[in-house]
Amino acid sequence: MNKPLRNSHPLFKIANNALVDLPAPINISSWWNFGSLLGLCLIIQILTGLFLAMHYTADINLAFYSVNHICRDVNYGWLLRTLHANGASFFFICIYLHVGRGMYYGSYMFTPTWLIGVIILFLVMGTAFMGYVLPWGQMSFWGATVITNLLSAIPYLGMDLVQWLWGGFAVDNATLTRFFTFHFILPFIVLAMTMIHLLFLHQTGSNNPIGLNSNIDKIPFHPYFTFKDIVGFIVMIFILISLVLISPNLLGDPDNFIPANPLVTPAHIQPEWYFLFAYAILRSIPNKLGGVIALVLSIAILMILPFYNLSKFRGIQFYPINQVMFWSMLVTVILLTWIGARPVEEPYVLIGQILTVVYFLYYLVNPLITKWWDNLLN
């Protein structure tokens, strides 16, 4: 009997095993939709970015005005730009929910998948930071100056590294050109890393909400989860389009409507909202190098999860105290986001420092509490 083309064609077979005949746990909830939503976000960002790049000019004298030109003169340029800017926000909403799901349900026990996921998160954060610099508004310029300056905290190599990154003695034309170059290439590297992320995931199969082996009860990915994913796509696109058409500048910074001026510093230099929690952690350490280390660790600490797991059950569904701790940690991150947007003055400094300690303590104490709970029930 002839096999369907999707089972015999060498290229279609790969797609088929990943998207059609893939055995998926029957009980995965909507929390498992965010992987496909991130794929959709990445495609939206690459497509809108590609068309924006056709009209953008990476030159400090022209960048701000080329963005203005895109919004005023290019057909649907305003739509492309607002979709791209707000698409980044949705990308981060989905990525944080995706990571939170992985932490809650113990998906980090797929060690290679998890570690590649954290690397993807770093790459996406780097891409978003460089994209924020491109319109060359006040916050673009000063954000680039402040964040790249952090490299100078590295002992011995610091200043050389910063000047090498800038391509001169200050953030200038060379910096903008290279940031545009990297901003263009990185999403394609993220795309390649996503393929590897999926490759490792499909070696083990998906986790599920009860954290047990689901090999005895699996269903094909298509049509069940393809349609479930499409429902997620519709919901997300609806919210994104609503934001873009009703209040496109809601999540942006008003300072970025002012062309970059190296002689005037904005009153409050702050990144986009999705970096504020990390920015608050950076600011809460009085020492420059210590702040940089804390900033990197705020994300890199996710990498310890697979190696510091002491529980008998996968995830924290069956650990009530850990559930309370998890949601408290989420509140901590939200409060850090609020602190990141506040000026550096009391009581905000102290609150930020307390929240930073609480944030890092979660990762260290959480496995110990699961161990204690297991011993209690023995």
UniProtKB/Swiss-Prot annotation:
GO terms for biological process: mitochondrial electron transport, ubiquinol to cytochrome c. Heme b b566 binds at H98, H197. GO terms for cellular component: mitochondrial inner membrane; respiratory chain complex III. Heme b b562 binds at H84, H183. It is a multi-pass membrane protein. Changing V235M: In strain: BG1. Disulfide bonds: none annotated. A ubiquinone binds at H202. PANTHER family: CYTOCHROME B. The main subunits of complex b-c1 are: cytochrome b, cytochrome c1 and the Rieske protein. Heme 1 (or BL or b562) is low-potential and absorbs at about 562 nm, and heme 2 (or BH or b566) is high-potential and absorbs at about 566 nm. Component of the ubiquinol-cytochrome c reductase complex (complex III or cytochrome b-c1 complex) that is part of the mitochondrial respiratory chain. The b-c1 complex mediates electron transfer from ubiquinol to cytochrome c. Contributes to the generation of a proton gradient across the mitochondrial membrane that is then used for ATP synthesis. This is Cytochrome b. It comes from Drosophila mauritiana (Fruit fly). The lineage of its organism: Eukaryota, Metazoa, Ecdysozoa, Arthropoda, Hexapoda.
